[in-house]
Every structure is written in structure tokens, then in C-alpha cells.
Amino acid sequence: MAGTPSFQKLMALADSQSAQAAVQIEQLRKAQIREKAREITEERNRQRKLQRERELRQKYEEEQRRQQAMEAKRIAASTRQTSERPPLSAEEAKRIREVKEKDRLESKKNERQGKPRSYNELLRQASSAPAVNETSSSGLLQSKDKRSQSPHSPKKPVKNSSSRDQPVRNSGATSTASLPPAGLRAGRGSQISASLAWLKTGGASAAPSNPRQPPPTSNFSNRKARYASNGLVQLQTGPKRDKRSAGEVQDEIMKRRQNSSISQAATPRTVSNSETSYVGSPALKQSKPNSLKSNNTSRKTSASSAITKPKARPHTSRHDEFVVSDDDELNDRVPDVSSEIWKIFGKRKQDYVSRDVFSDEDDMEATGHDVWREEQAAARAARLEDELEEQRERERELAKKRRKNK
């Protein structure tokens, strides 16, 4: 079978297939080698690129650090130049001295004229002033004498000082308000410094034992004299605020009303009885003209006092208001000057004198006439406001037109 043609063909075919396979394998191997070489070259190129970028970044960072260092050096140099003050020239020093001298002269002038000083100036003067003796007034007088005899203290005429110190001599006797002899009187600056020192110590200085001066009447008068002598303003003057509650105030008003009603009920109505008896008897009218004059004068004085200080009338019901009392008839019959004056002004005196000042109804409630008057006043105010607004609007429009025409 070895020499058969079929076997030879098969062997040749196998050889050709193996050669083709070997060629294909070789081609595949070469292709793999080329692919591997290409990948290696790409990796090398990428590494070179990364290295180049790294180097560029390092150079950039170094440049930034160098610029920051230079900027810091420049800022330090500029700040050092600004902090270090250059030496003053002769002209600048002379100008500064002239300004200071001018300020000092102005302060002295203001002190002579007695102008008020600021709070900071007073505090500075008090801090620089000598210590004040708290137990006696001798140390205070000595310090005032030293400050008055110093060459820097301004000289004041004796006339002004005596006129300024005159109200202090009449006021209370305190450590700051007590006056030294004529040779030891100090200026206004020493008085202000002593008063501020007294305020800082809390007012602990004792009053001088002077037998000639009378004892102080009260703490309020002493404090008032002290502030008047030193030119300071006292805070919280006048009566204190009423700290009572609304209930306490109402209770006090009720007590006053009850007391007034009790007093009116206890007093007999002798005036009306005597007046009626006097009017009914004509013989008594002719026999006692002097008593009539005295009664008229006393009645006029009582009526005038009633105008200034009206009394509370007892509470009466509204159904009895139409009844005319004897007092009203008496007041209508007897001519009164004050009533005539009230009539001149278009008012009826009895309506105001007999008003109950403690009545809640009269004081707290408004009548229809009061409401109408308030409405009329509000309408007039609104109308006036509308007219003013319309006038302003017209003026604005005219101004706008003028601007457009220009």
C-alpha cells in the first residue's frame, strides 16, 4: 500500500497543509511580536510624557513659591517703611508747636470766660488734680491755694469771683460749697476739680466745723448748693414719681369723695335760711344795710374761691336734676362780678363751678356734642391736608414740565 498513488497524494497533501500551517503560525507570531513592540513604544511614550508634565509642574510650583517670597519681601519692606516715621523737619516741628500753643491759649480763654467743659476734660482734670482731704476742709483749701498761686492757673478779677461765690455763701455748708477767706479763693478750675474729686470719693468728705455758718437745713439744699457752686447739673430734680397702683389711686379718690360728702352733710345750710328770711322781711332789709354789704362781699369772695377750687357736690340721682336748689336761686338773685365775666366769654359759671370733678360719668364719657365737635375738627384737618397734598402735586407737575421744556 505504500506505493499506491492515493497514499502519496495524501502525504503530499499533508505536507502542503503542514507548510501552510507553519507559515500561518509564523505570521501570527510575527504579528504578536509587532503588537507587543507597539504597546511597548506607546508605554514608553506615555512615561516620557508624564515625566515631562511632572517636570513642568515642579518648575511652575517653584516659580510660584519664588514669586510669593518676593511679594512677601516687598510687603515687609513697604510696611517697615510706613512704620518707621521719618524725622521731622524744623518747619514741621515749628508748625506742630504752634498748633499746640494755639489750643492751649484757646482753652485758657474758654476757662476765663467760664464756658462749659466737656465730660472728658472734667475727668482728665479730676484725675490730674491733687488729692482732697476727706476729714477736714483745710487740705481742700490748701490745694485750692496752691492751684490759684501757680503760674499756669489763669488770673481772674476779684469782682467776678466774689459775685460768683455770693450764692454759695448763702447756701448750705458742705466741703465743696464752703468758701475760704478772700486771700485763699481759688478759680473756677480748682472748684470743678474739687467737686469731681468729691464725686469720685462718693461724697465721703465731712462738713467743716465752722461755728459762724449755720447747720445745713436738708440734704437736698446742700446738694443743690454744691451743684450750683460747681456749675454742674443735678439729675432727677423735682418730685418723685407716683408708684401707687390704679387700685390704690381709686381707693384714695373714693375716700376723698366719702369725706367730702360727710363734711357737706354735717355742715348746716345757714346761708339759704338766712337769705330767705332776709328776703322775706323788708323791715330787716332796711335796718341792716351794713350786714348786706358784708354778706355780699363774703359771698363774692366765696364765689371767687369756688372758681379757683371747686368742691365736690354730693351724689344725686338724675331724676332730681330738674329741681332748683336754694343755692342756685340765691346765686341767680345776687349779682356777682365773676358771673358777669363768665358771661362776657360766653360761659355759664354755674355749669363749671358745680361740676363734680370726681365723677366718672362726666370725665370719662363724651356727649353727642363732643363727638360732633371732634368729627368737625377731624374733617377740617383732613380737608386741609388734602388741599396741601393737591398743591404739592401741582407744584411737582409744574416742575416736571419745566424740566422737560429745558
From Swiss-Prot:
Supply the Pfam families for this chain.
SPT2
Cellular component terms per the entry's GO annotation:
heterochromatin; mitotic spindle; nucleolus; nucleus
> Which residues fall in a compositionally biased region of kind Basic and acidic residues?
38-74, 91-114, 383-398
Its main localization is nucleus
| Localization per Swiss-Prot or TrEMBL | Nucleus
- Share an example GO biological-process annotation for this protein: transcription elongation-coupled chromatin remodeling
Entries under PANTHER family matching the protein: PROTEIN SPT2 HOMOLOG, YEAST SPT2-RELATED
Function summary: Histone chaperone that stabilizes pre-existing histone tetramers and regulates replication-independent histone exchange on chromatin. Required for normal chromatin refolding in the coding region of transcribed genes, and for the suppression of spurious transcription. Global regulatory protein that plays positive as well as negative regulatory roles in transcription.
The entry's protein name is Protein spt2
Q: Which organism is it from?
A: Schizosaccharomyces pombe (strain 972 / ATCC 24843) (Fission yeast)
